[in-house]
Amino acid sequence: LRAVMKFLPFYLITSLFVWSSAVYGQVSQILEDEAVAWLQGLIRVDTINPPGNETRAVEFFADIFDAEGISYETAESAPGRGNIWAKIEGGDEPALILLQHTDVVPAEEEFWTIDPLSGDIRDGYILGRGARDMKGLGIIQLATFLSLHRSGVELNRDVIFLATADEEAGGFFGVGWLIDNHPEIFEDVGFLLNEGGGGSSDEGDIVFGVEVTQKVPVWLRLTAIDTPGHGSSPRPQTAVTRIVQALNTLLENPFPPRIIGPVNDYFAALSVDMNEEWGPSYADINSAIQDPAFVEKLHANRAGHNSLIRDTCSMTRMSGSSKINVIPPTAWAELDCRILPDKPAEQFIAELDELIGYTGVEIETIMAFTPAISETNSRLFDAIVSVTQELHPGSRVIPSVSTGFTDSHFTRDLGIVSYGFNPLITESGEHTGVHGNDEQVREAAFRQAVTDYYAVVRNVVID
């Protein structure tokens, strides 16, 4: 065999290597190298939203698909707002979508130590806006999709690669638009993998969070109207004081804690590795939240977990007069509210109106999604558990609830079982820079995630 291999062309050896690795559930060093290069290249494609310009990313993927001989379709929801999808056909089982968004949030270059669109590797890390959110996972999905294509193995279901626009601004030019204008993409789809989960390692203890639901964003504008006047003659009540009064009422009356099923499961799983200070409370979180002292301590020390036990509203924008010496006729404030997915937005808004309605402010809904939860009794979730435990002995998989939102809420509304899963392992204390400065992903962890993601998907799509 060695003698035969000696005279084979390099490209054929490469193809055999990739094929044999794919057949046995692994990806090759060659594909890992390609994935690193692809991620660097995709980071360099400017898709900062606003304005998005995701068609640039569509062209990036189209070039790769053309080289691989893979057919694909594209559609713009607006000029420059491109979406692309491709399919590997398989058997009659409900299809699997690998979903990613190609837009990224802005980066304030003066606070970075490197060009945010450089994609350079420094000290073992790939840097740039989107390295983690979510061009990194997008390339991991691409590597899996191409591995399946190159292997030529028979699949039990269709596998769809879907890269979309606008998630960072709500997804209305991406998945939301595609559901309305290209519903055929989502027909006969049973499973979807998206962002929202991740792996963490603390002194070798590895935990993979799989997002099964998320808090529902309810973005609101409070508006007050009152008599205008000169700033030199203060009035006892103005549009501005009404807004201040409403906001102060919100501050003084936090929404009461309550526990939904996925949060209870999540806290119970976390309790296993916690010390005596936190472990018993997390193990029985329903009882723990009855103690105001615990709730206060949780809020002070673990803000993210506090957000999982109650509805929240962050005060993010305000406006009053355009001049310092004018009492304005109107004033407004905007709230980023996130509610647990066990109640509709309409009920939450009615409760909010009961709380602050006495101030005379009007509540306007800017954006609100519908709540949905993906159950864990599925072949896909079982595959995530079994494969990650095989690849990382002793690791655990925890169903998690995201305080942020992803495009999965759109697909859950269609009845598609949608999980946020990313096998990328982040070490305790490791800088990530997601939505911040010097966003980065450890190259070694990224390479491992390429292998792990493919193994999970392969388990589901090959009998």
Task: Name each region found by the language model.
Residues 20-22:
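N-terminal signal peptide c-region/cleavage motif recognized by signal peptidases
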Residues 176-178, 232-256:
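A short core secondary-structure module
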